[in-house]
Amino acid sequence: MYIEVTGYGPALVLIHGWAMHSGVFAPLVEQLRPHHTLYLVDLPGHGYNHTTPTPLALPQVVHAIAAATPPAVWLGWSLGGLFALHAAATLPQVRGLIMLAATPCFVRREDWPHAVEVSIFTQFAQDLKQNYTETINRFLALDTLGSTHAQSELRQLRKILNARHTPNTATLQAGLELLAHTDLRRAVIDLTPPSLWIAGQRDRLVPAASIQAATALAPSGQTELLTITGGGHAPFLSHANQMTAALQHFIATLP
């Protein structure tokens, strides 16, 4: 599996969200690469890995990334957070975990009220079969909904998406299945490496309350929470400076 490597310094793995590719992290990459060696992952079926045979499944993807990277901090945005969290729960080489607009359980359950209804993802899966482009555009709009810079972020996401190979319907449906049915709350409770959880105050897809609930599950004393005021689901597009400062501070405190 191809992983782009850039920069110098302590290793940081970055994993993107649904339908996107690692190019979405450009605002962070620009500021982080003078200080960190960045491992920019395109998930299977996405971007430069659009033809990789690796299935879009947590164990297989995490194993493939781990085989190609040194001990590192792992950052996952949205869907990417599930892969980063699974890695942190299963691999000793994960020095720290950064969950960016990500949660161990993306859908509402009886004992997990601060999340979206599963119908959000099942409806997107159905709509993909009818109109691929319109469905992708609606999801990107949901990514930016609520942000104080929504229109600018939406234009950025559309431009970034089309800069590399776009995933096919089967790949996107596999990602939606992960979002709809994965529950890694037990992994958070048993988490060993320190973790930083970043929420967008105005995120409509992963409400800040769900990330706050996740941090309450994590071991005390090694868990940090940052809420980006005015941020939506992609706060690194609108608040890159604040994000970069938070990431560097967290990584600098790791043993």
From Swiss-Prot:
Q: Do you know which InterPro entries this protein is assigned to?
A: AB_hydrolase_1, AB_hydrolase_fold, AB_hydrolase_sf, BioH
Tell me its family: Belongs to the AB hydrolase superfamily. Carboxylesterase BioH family.
Q: Which Pfam families match?
A: Abhydrolase_1
> Native species of this protein?
Xylella fastidiosa (strain M12)
The catalytic activity of this protein is classed by the Enzyme Commission as 3.1.1.85
What does the protein in this record do?
The physiological role of BioH is to remove the methyl group introduced by BioC when the pimeloyl moiety is complete. It allows to synthesize pimeloyl-ACP via the fatty acid synthetic pathway through the hydrolysis of the ester bonds of pimeloyl-ACP esters.
Entry superkingdom? Bacteria
Pathway assigned to this chain's UniProt record: Cofactor biosynthesis; biotin biosynthesis
Q: Where is the signal peptide?
A: none
Could you describe the subunit structure of this protein?
Answer: Monomer.
The entry's substrate-binding residues are 18, 78-79, 139-143, 233
The biological processes this protein is annotated with in GO are: biotin biosynthetic process
Q: Which GO terms describe its molecular function?
A: pimelyl-[acyl-carrier protein] methyl ester esterase activity
Name by which UniProt lists this protein: Pimeloyl-[acyl-carrier protein] methyl ester esterase
Enumerate the active-site residues: 78, 203, 233
Localization of this protein: Cytoplasm
